[in-house]
Amino acid sequence: MEAHQFLKAPGITTAVEQAALATANSALANAVVVRPFLSHQQIEILINLMQPRQLVFRPEVFWNQPIQRVIHNELELYCRARSGRCLEIGAHPRSINDNPNVVHRCFLRPVGRDVQRWYTAPTRGPAANCRRSALRGLPAADRTYCFDGFSGCSCPAETGIALYSLHDMSPSDVAEAMFRHGMTRLYAALHLPPEVLLPPGTYRTASYLLIHDGRRVVVTYEGDTSAGYNHDVSNLRSWIRTTKVTGDHPLVIERVRAIGCHFVLLLTAAPEPSPMPYVPYPRSTEVYVRSIFGPGGTPSLFPTSCSTKSTFHAVPAHIWDRLMLFGATLDDQAFCCSRLMTYLRGISYKVTVGTLVANEGRNASEDALTAVITAAYLTICHQRYLRTQAISKGIRRLEREHDQKFITRLYSWLFEKSGRDYIPGRQLEFYAQCRRWLSAGFHLDPRVLVFDESAPCHCRTVIRKALSKFCCFMKWLGQECTCFLQPAEGVVGDQGHDNESYEGSDVDPAESAISDISGSYVVPGTALQPLYQALDLPDEIVARACRLTATVKVSQVDGRIDCETLLGNKTFRTSFVDGAVLETNGPERHNLSFDASQSTMAAGPFSLTYAASAAGLEVRYVGAGLDHRAIFAPGVSPRSNPGEVTAFCSALYRFNREAQRHSLTGNLWFHPEGLIGLFAPFSPGHVWESAKPFCGESTLYTRTWSEVDAVSSPTRPDLGFMSEPPIPSRAATPTLAAPLPPLAPDPSPPSSAPALDEPASAATSGVPAITHQTARHRRLLFTYPDGSKVFAGSLFESTCTWLVNASNVDHCPGGGLCHAFYQRYPASFDAACFVMRDGAAAYTLTPRPIIHRVAPDYRLEHNPKRLEAAYRETCSRLGTAAYPLLGTGIYQVPIGPSFDAWERNHRPGDELYLPELAARWFEANRPTRPTLTITEDAARTANLAIELDSATDVGRACAGCRVTPGVVQYQFTAGVPGSGKSRSITRADVDVVVVPTRELRNAWRRRGFAAFTPHTAARVTDGRRVVIDEAPSLPPHLLLLHMQRAATVHLLGDPNQIPAIDFEHPGLVPAIRPDLAPTSWWHVTHRCPADVCELIRGAYPMIQTTSRVLRSLFWGEPAVGQKLVFTQAAKPANPGSVTVHDSQGATYTYTTIIATADARGLIQSSRAHAIVALTRHTEKWVIIDAPGLLREVGISDAIVNNFFLAGGEIGHQRPSVIPRGNPDANVDTLAAFPPSCQISAFHQLAEELGHRPAPVAAVLPPCPELEQGLLYLPQELTTCDSVVTFELTDIVHCRMAAPSQRKAVVSTLVGRYGRRTKLYNASHSDVRDSLARFIPAIGPVQVTTCELYELVEAMVEKGQDGSAVLELDLCNRDVSRITFFQKDCNKFTTGETIAHGKVGQGISAWSKTFCALFGPWFRAIEKAILALLPQGVFYGDAFDDTVFSAAVAAAKASMVFENDFSEFDSTQNNFSLGLECAIMEECGMPQGLIRLYHLIRSAWILQAPKESLLGFWKKHSGEPGTLLWNTVWNMAVITHCYDFRDLQVAAFKGDDSIVLCSEYRQSPGAAVLIAGCGLKLKVDFRPMRLYAGVVVAPGLGALPDVVRFAGRLTEKNWGPGPERADELRIAVSDFLRKLTNVAQMCVDVVSRVYGVSPGLVHNLIGMLQAVADGKAHFTESVKPVLDLTNSILCRVE
């Protein structure tokens, strides 16, 4: 603002003037200083661009590009102020010495204009080295800069800045480069003019001149004396449009500062980018008007298209707006082109009155003026026409309305009362226009442009995702998949009860008998040769293993198996427990799934079962196409040759390392005892016994994968500089982690003990002698709040980025741990490969990130400062590090000082590995309990809350109490509801118990404790041992008071339950609520029944129960036990009730929850209230839900009752969701297909298929005769004569069947479900035996709450609730009603679209009650079938598309057998229904349900809106289990009727089926089944065929059917609202995503299948690209309906 008048004022007279002066002073104090000399026009430009910032002009320098440089400096200050220590990309040479806060700079080798900049760079300071390297082509002198570019550099940095240096990189390239640097934030300044969105041309604005040639854009600002900016157009467009990057390197891009078209973009690495639409140019001062005349060109026989040669003219927005307002409001008589030109000439002159600008004016060329007049005149003509038409139509409508009589007005009034919401103007017809029409306008306004596009990164995620899903793919093939298993946690503490009203049973629960296999067994390698071949081991290793024999001593105790393997002169130990981690040679992690009761083990694709037999131990190995049995005899084997054993171990180690270097995902790391052992190939807890233990040597032949170990890793980590100070002290409150039981025997002597002996080495193997030490699986001892961990074990088991070596002064190979590093990484000791030194620490990346650091020698001098520095100097890095205790070996540093030094000088996430001696010291000196820091602000707020409390009667005991800042130590035992937290407290451990309610106080006092409520306890907790029960629910100020006053404090509670509530709403409770970290978690509940545990498993994933009650939730029964309500208002209406909040911590045998209407918001918003209400009872919970609040969240009494009535059980099943991935652009052949014209593509499709525009919209075929059943008709069959559609083209490529009207419904009912059913009475055994080729005997199926949850989830996703599910009463028609609907979609065809004479298609819907009754069973049966399918057989859509495509591609020599079922639903009869019931009986479904299903299917009534049909048998394509039983019947018919040779792939989905084989023939029993059931099979056998919307091409894969997809789009109605157009765009985008990498292959294959030209498919893909871009054109058509129906003949049976 202009402030001179206030600055010169002699005095301040009013408050307004005082405020204005303060505003002016503030604006001037924060003004931008402009130093260059500027012209008057440049000053105006800068003032307009920099608004609302105040500018102060102090000219003192001459700049070549003053406007850009001022903007650049302003944005640079913003970026550098927020980035801190950062990495800079493409820094200007002049800025190097001025910014010491940059840790690294990325440059490119200078070319062209950059050479001049380097010549003028400073010759002193840090810039001198950069200048010398740039101009002489020398390598970088230090790590502060490089000339590899941003994409080629890998220097780690968390934050970066790029000032006008990313114009030649796309957002995807920047995302990958940021990931390579480990960068989380990047501030990028970019120049993004809006003209790059326009066609090529020359654009002149008030600020700059822009020349756009289609590929590059050159921008020159006003007054520039040097060359302008030259950027790539495609990259600029990407930066303008993109707001996020998806893929393996996701980013969100936010525009945080803008000056004109100069933007600062903040790129942030985020795991799940969310939509971030933005308007880039809301303050644009130009509107771009299109000229209908293009620029002059060269003569040509064929004129070029206007779209590529048209030009735009930049017109000031105020000129265009005023011109539009003037022309639109002119009188009809006065409106003419000359008057518009006169007005435009007038407003184009600049007019000033004194210092006031009355008219800004404009200087324009003749071409621009002509374009503006033309565009304005035509646009105003269009608007005036619309105005005239609207008024004319409105007047005619008003005349009709005023002429209406009383009866008509009364009818309209009644109709409006009962009709929809009133929308003004709906009675008028709307004017429809398209984007490319003349009436759509001639101008583009940047102010209204909105962008929110995502750019996929160029990573190879397709291969990575496919490999990562290999384990689950093996499960689909019928193998065991245990990738979801995690190690089981033990229960910590006593298992008591927290309420004396509940007592456990005196009868011990029964346990299943576990067979004991303890003993000694002989394991010859020859017995496992098939397993070695399945593991794909080299022949050398297989031959060596077959020559060896081992003795395995097995000890089985408490679900754990310990094996001692004697192989030659070596002894190995392994420990098999459930959840044990298996070592791998890749990034994949495998956990062992071990069930001692079932005698099974599994991990990855391998599994085994074992059993004791008379001959010994019988083990069955399954996996990777292997099914092998081996029997191991008891006894002791002769000792194998030690030389052979050593050679086998060495060869096996070399194979593991070779596989590690070339593995993307990896497999198991094979140990000797894992291959020559009972339970091959598993070897968890690998121990190689030796006599000289030191940290790490014991794993010389063991390798736990770390991504940075792989030489071929594309993202090898780099070192960086510490961006934050080290962790200050031990006061960083660690969190105590419950230690796992040790997996190794008693520790060996400490590392300082002398070596006893060396194992013998084989002279024949040529392998040097290597000392083998005891290797133990690492054991977690402690976890700190910052994520750091302390382990007992070998640091070589760590997955950290860096490993720290306890080196010597010269960093040469030595003894102890340094020797182990040299054995593993000899190249890491090469001083020439050290990339950085920090003090005495040396950093290397060869062959993996390692830090060599030497501790002080305490044998000579005790030097604590050097010991601190030894750890501190290892923190100049990015990523985590694994440490040993430095100096505690040879240099004799005590364990305590070394541990304290590490604790004070490490980074979050680091790991410390202790040998057994140090581990025992650590356990004896474990860090203290976690601490809570009370800050001054928290203490002040708590004291304010205490003062408010002390003024009340309840809180008067708190008077005078205060909370002071400080640190409080505490112990916090958290657990699931009913886990016995309070029962674990004994009277000897505590002096005072603080509880939140009187009920809990009385319960504690009955147990003999001194219990008090929070306010009263303020008098007695000082200096006492205090236990605080339900600590999270205590008011936080009282909780802090008691924790600070107590001598020791032990907190009990559940963080997931109701916290302290701020009833008075002063805002103090949430402000001081402490963040308490549980020191232990208890997961076993002794209160909650099984069904309650299932409901709350989302909040407590590891919950288990000892309760024997399976079902405790009941609806509609009388109230029993304690009544619970949600709100205080409901208590008076329910005497004796308590609120859910008050009942927290209590236990009742029976409870009744009463949900009132006022609790709706509380139930939907507070998860904690629901958890507390659910977990108060032990036996029974009665729900009284009159308002239906629980039904609103998807659960009702009918659903639960019917589920248990149908035989459902509490339990777990695998989910039915199939993981699917979106293909990323690894080849991206789709990018070669530009968008094409929609009209030409559909016309070419019509020419190729021979289709022509149809004169009718639909055909009502003649209604066939009703052959069976009874049809109910309405008195009138109303029809419509015409249909209005919004279509993509007037040529339809689908069968034009009947629309949804009465005659069409009748024709469909009669034609599809009124045909006579041919019954076939025969045994199902033959067909079931044939079906066993694909679906073996299923066995009993368990229906669990998992299927019930999936059913409810599907209902909620469809917008349904539980109100439609009724109690199972067959007398109620609503329970058994089957509703019929007419389908609108028609089938794509290459033949005749009209003269087919086929009736329409219908879909039925069973009642929600039957769906809820049978749905869980059908889901469970479907899961059982999927688990039994052989390899190569695909069911429905329960597979990933890439897996199916890979299977088809692998069957290169096969032909495609295709069967087309005609009238598939209509031909199903009593035989197909009997087969379904037989399979249900085979699965263990209750007989009552089977008979009910048979009854519903054998005789039914289809209820249409006005018609109904009583019929028999058939199949309805909408009932529960439609896909399941249709697919099973399809499988049964195909397997029984045809025999296939060399079957490779078979796929079945409903009535569609294909089989890839070399030859087929009809089986002998086929004719009987076909004739008996009246089947209509049409078989085809060709090289390529169609299946379920894809083209099946053996050897190539399953490719999307472009022709069929495009043809089906022509039949649908895409209007009248914009929602349908959005659905079209989304559907087409999803389809194009499947074409990303196979577009060119689709062109060749699809054209061959349909016999069309490849150019058609190419054109169709381009058309789909245009539709996905939102450029679809719709045509409104009104076509008649051809009615060919005749009289319906009914025959009553």
Swiss-Prot record:
Domain named (+)RNA virus helicase C-terminal: residues: 1083-1216
Could you name the Gene Ontology cellular component terms for this entry?
host cell perinuclear region of cytoplasm
Its subcellular locations are:
Host cytoplasm; Host cytoplasm, Host perinuclear region
What species does this protein belong to? Answer: Hepatitis E virus genotype 1 (isolate Human/India/Hyderabad) (HEV-1)
Self-association state and partner proteins as the record states = The protease domain interacts with host EIF2AK4 (via C-terminus); this interaction inhibits dimerization of EIF2AK4 and prevents EIF2AK4-mediated phosphorylation of host EIF2A.
Keyword list, A-Z: ATP-binding, Disulfide bond, Helicase, Host cytoplasm, Hydrolase, Magnesium, Metal-binding, Methyltransferase, Nucleotide-binding, Nucleotidyltransferase, Protease, RNA-binding, RNA-directed RNA polymerase, Thiol protease, Transferase, Viral RNA replication, Zinc
Please give the name of this protein: Non-structural polyprotein pORF1
**Domain (RdRp catalytic): residue spans on this chain:** 1454-1565
